[in-house]
């Protein structure tokens, strides 16, 4: 069996509105990664190792994302994004505790989670309970990964509902602040579309600022999702390799 090499990426994004021509960014295609988005707006990226202070967290990256559709009320809005915990495989209990501490230290307004929470049904409750302990003023939003659909799906849904964590399965939620709003759209993992019969299309207004949350970037090849401005995806564990056109 091929050995898994796993690390957790935590990204903290600062949204800002910008009106100068230099920063005007058209709606991005779904396959555009968050890193591509950052480069397109010519913003600074800082990266730091978080080994000693937060053991178990391999990489922390901070992005400032400027876009003309971000309402002024959301200037400085902080989003924390994590994905692929695969608890309790290589990511252990102490690492999970440190992740929660690190997330709380970021003082994010919203937490977005990209799926693949666990490596066993017995770990569903503790990992979701830990994520529920992250303090965010505007909620935690999640899509599920292929691992989550393969096992314990019903239990995951129950646990998320019990902890008031928003599961986005072809759904759009609205975040409101001072009369303005941004949208968070979430889609199901593409490996499961055919068997679950969920419509793969989300129609979103080009006038809204839309964050698309998906487990895998391969989703862009299978569904029609238009007018998204920022795409956050997991699954690839820091890289993307495909063979013969198959999913990574």
Question: Over which residues does each language-model region extend?
Answer:
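Acidic, histidine-bearing metal-coordination/catalytic regions of metal-dependent phosphoesterases
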Residues: 2-78
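Extended active-site neighborhood of metal-dependent phosphoesterases/phosphodiesterases
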Residues: 40, 52, 64-66, 129-193, ...
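Membrane-embedded segments
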Residues: 56-58, 70-166
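Active-site-proximal beta-strand elements of phosphoester/diester hydrolases
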Residues: 76-86, 181-190, 211-215
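Catalytic metal-binding/acid-base residues of hydrolase active sites
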Residues: 86, 117-118, 147-148, 172-173, ...
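Conserved beta-sheet core of the metallophosphoesterase superfamily
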Residues: 132, 217-248
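Short, charged, surface-exposed secondary-structure boundary motifs
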Residues: 177-179, 195-196, 240-247
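Short beta-strand/loop segments at the ligand-binding rim of alpha/beta enzyme cores
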Residues: 203-212
């Amino acid at each position: 069996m091929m050995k898994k090499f796993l690390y957790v990426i935590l990204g903290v994004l600062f949204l800002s509105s910008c009106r100068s021509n230099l920063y005007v960014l058209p709606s991005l295609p779904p396959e555009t990664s968050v890193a591509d988005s950052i480069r397109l707006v010519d913003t600074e990226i800082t990266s730091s190792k978080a080994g000693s202070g937060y053991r178990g967290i391999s990489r922390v990256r901070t992005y400032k994302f400027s876009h003309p559709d971000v309402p002024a009320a959301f200037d400085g809005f902080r989003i924390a994004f994590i994905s692929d915990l695969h608890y309790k495989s290589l990511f252990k209990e102490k690492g999970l505790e440190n992740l929660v501490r690190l997330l709380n230290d970021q003082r994010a307004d919203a937490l977005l989670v990209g799926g693949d929470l666990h490596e066993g049904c017995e770990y569903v409750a503790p990992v979701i309970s830990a994520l529920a302990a992250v303090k965010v003023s505007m909620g935690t939003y999640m899509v599920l990964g292929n691992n989550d659909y393969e096992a314990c799906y019903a239990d995951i849904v129950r646990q998320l509902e019990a902890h008031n964590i928003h599961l986005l399965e072809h759904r759009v939620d609205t975040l409101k602040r001072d009369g303005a709003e941004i949208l968070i759209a979430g889609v199901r993992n593409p490996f499961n579309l055919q068997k679950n019969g969920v419509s793969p299309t989300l129609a979103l207004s080009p006038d809204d600022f839309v964050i698309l949350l998906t487990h895998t970037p391969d989703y862009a090849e299978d569904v029609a999702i238009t007018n998204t401005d920022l795409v956050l995806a997991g699954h690839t564990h820091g890289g993307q390799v495909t063979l013969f056109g198959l999913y990574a």
